[in-house]
A protein has these predicted regions:
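N-terminal secretory targeting modules
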Residues: 1-79, 255-257
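Alpha-helical scaffolding within the catalytic cores
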Residues: 64-68, 127-138, 168-174
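Conserved SGNH/GDSL esterase-like catalytic core that processes O-acyl groups on lipids
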Residues: 74-159
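Sec-exported extracytoplasmic/periplasmic mature domains
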Residues: 105-109, 139, 143, 151, ...
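Conserved beta-strand segments of alpha/beta enzyme cores
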Residues: 114-116, 183, 213-215
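Charged helix-capping and loop-helix junction motifs
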Residues: 132, 161-171, 199-203
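Active-site segments of SGNH/GDSL-like serine hydrolases
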Residues: 149-153, 174-203
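Catalytic His-Asp segment of secreted/periplasmic serine-dependent ester chemistry enzymes
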Residues: 193-257
Length: 257
């Protein structure tokens, strides 16, 4: 009898050990699977984070009009041409186009924004632009964006305001035809201080610009009053201080700075 009981106890113990072993093994497998699954999730999240960080590091850090333009084109590069009179040049320092582009170089993480400045000097008037092949010259550069100064000061005393607008419009049409898709930003020539006829020509430009296929950026409000203009304009053209002021005003629109 004792042997029978002892044998039964041994069998129960063995069965219990077997059940415990299988329970333990099943539990270990479950934990292992959960660990592998979590590791997979963590790795996936790390990959997502890594991809996002890489995207952010390559992201476009330019605001304003240019940032919107790059976003709309899904582009990370652009070529810009600044075209105008001697008001876009500065013999004594950096011109306002150079100062604007310098801000882009300092503030952009990855976009390749290249540019050039094409000046027609102080004598060429708007009615000569097509005849002298300037539309062709711009087209050769194949810009994505053309920043066009109105040449109003060059036209002052040579052409009526309405004629200036007509020639400017024809020039814009010619450029747009040769460079399909180019974005054109039109800016008025700088103020010059006390004058009679010239401000009226700018007024006509302001009135007619909305009818042109351009984005018009009037920066005149950023300039000081006529009696304070001497430090910013000399012989009708911007001084270094004037170029800095113009660059600051245009940059607020162009790159949001």
């Amino acid at each position: 009898m004792k042997n029978t009981v002892f044998t039964a106890l041994i069998m129960v113990s063995v069965v219990g050990m077997v059940i415990a072993h299988f329970y333990y093994q099943n539990r270990v497998n479950t934990i292992a699977k959960e660990a592998i699954s979590q590791a997979s999730v963590d790795t996936h999240n790390q990959e997502k984070t890594s991809t996002k960080a890489e995207h952010d590091s390559e992201g476009i850090e330019i605001g304003g009009w240019l940032g919107d333009f790059l976003d709309s084109q899904d582009a990370d590069s652009a070529y810009i041409v600044f075209f105008g009179s001697s008001s876009i040049e500065n013999e004594n320092g950096k011109s306002w186009p150079e100062l604007v582009m310098e801000q882009i170089d300092n503030g952009a993480a990855s976009p390749a924004i290249d540019y050039e400045v094409i000046s027609v000097g102080s004598d060429t008037t708007s009615d000569q632009l097509l005849a002298e092949g300037f539309a062709d010259k711009i087209a050769e550069s194949e810009p994505d964006v053309l920043v066009l100064e109105s040449l109003t000061l060059n036209d002052n005393g040579n052409l009526a305001a309405s004629d200036s607008i007509a020639h400017l419009s024809a020039f814009i049409d010619a450029v747009s035809e040769q460079i399909p898709g180019v974005e054109i930003i039109l800016v008025p020539t700088n103020p010059i201080g006390p004058a009679t006829v010239y401000p009226g020509q700018i007024d006509v430009l302001n009135e007619q610009a909305p009818s042109l296929p351009v984005t018009y950026v009037d920066h005149w409000d950023a300039w000081p009053a006529e009696e304070e203009m001497a430090a910013y304009v000399e012989s009708g053209r911007p001084t270094s201080e004037g170029h800095e002021l113009w660059a600051s005003a245009f940059s607020q629109f162009f790159i949001g700075e």
